[in-house]
């Protein structure tokens, strides 16, 4: 498993190389897309990126949790969380890549 983390700058570099925009324009485009995704989620809208994933805001009820160090119970207040559900196409690409790597390692 790789430990590489893709950053905004990495995404901007890819856009710069593949689309032909300047690095500044590419960074602005990446920022614009990410801002729109965030704004949609803040408004409570689901964001579906076909063949990639769906991001959705979900409400979680209040519940009782436990401090792992002390074992003391404490209420966890209700909150809203973002969920990520990978599309089947993305899941399959990841699985295929994993299988190909395993096969290569066996040879």
From Swiss-Prot:
Molecular function GO terms recorded: DNA binding; structural constituent of chromatin
UniProt cross-references to Gene3D superfamilies, sorted A to Z: IHF-like DNA-binding proteins
SMART domains recorded: BHL
DNA-binding keyword on record: yes
A cellular component term, taken from the record's GO annotations: cytosol
Keywords, ordered alphabetically: DNA recombination, DNA-binding, Transcription, Transcription regulation, Translation regulation
InterPro entries cross-referenced by the UniProt entry: Hist_DNA-bd, Histone-like_DNA-bd_CS, IHF-like_DNA-bd_dom_sf, IHF_alpha
GO terms of biological process kind: DNA recombination; positive regulation of metabolic process; regulation of DNA-templated transcription; regulation of translation
PROSITE patterns tied to this protein: HISTONE_LIKE (PS00045)
Any single Pfam family the record assigns to this protein: Bac_DNA_binding
Membrane-traversing stretches: none
UniProt similarity note: Belongs to the bacterial histone-like protein family.
Job description of the protein: This protein is one of the two subunits of integration host factor, a specific DNA-binding protein that functions in genetic recombination as well as in transcriptional and translational control.
Assembly with partners or alone: Heterodimer of an alpha and a beta chain.
Protein name: Integration host factor subunit alpha
Naturally occurring in which organism (per UniProt): Bartonella tribocorum (strain CIP 105476 / IBS 506)
């Amino acid at each position: 498993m790789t430990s590489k983390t893709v950053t905004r700058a990495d995404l901007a570099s890819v856009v710069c190389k593949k689309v032909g925009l300047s690095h500044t324009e590419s960074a602005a485009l990446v920022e614009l897309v990410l801002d729109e995704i965030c704004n949609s989620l803040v408004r409570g809208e689901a964001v579906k990126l076909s063949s990639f994933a769906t991001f959705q805001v979900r409400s979680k009820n209040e519940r009782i949790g436990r401090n792992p160090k002390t074992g003391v119970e404490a209420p966890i207040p209700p909150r809203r969380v973002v969920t990520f559900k990978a599309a089947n196409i993305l899941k399959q690409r990841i699985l295929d890549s994993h299988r190909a790597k395993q096969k290569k390692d066996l040879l």
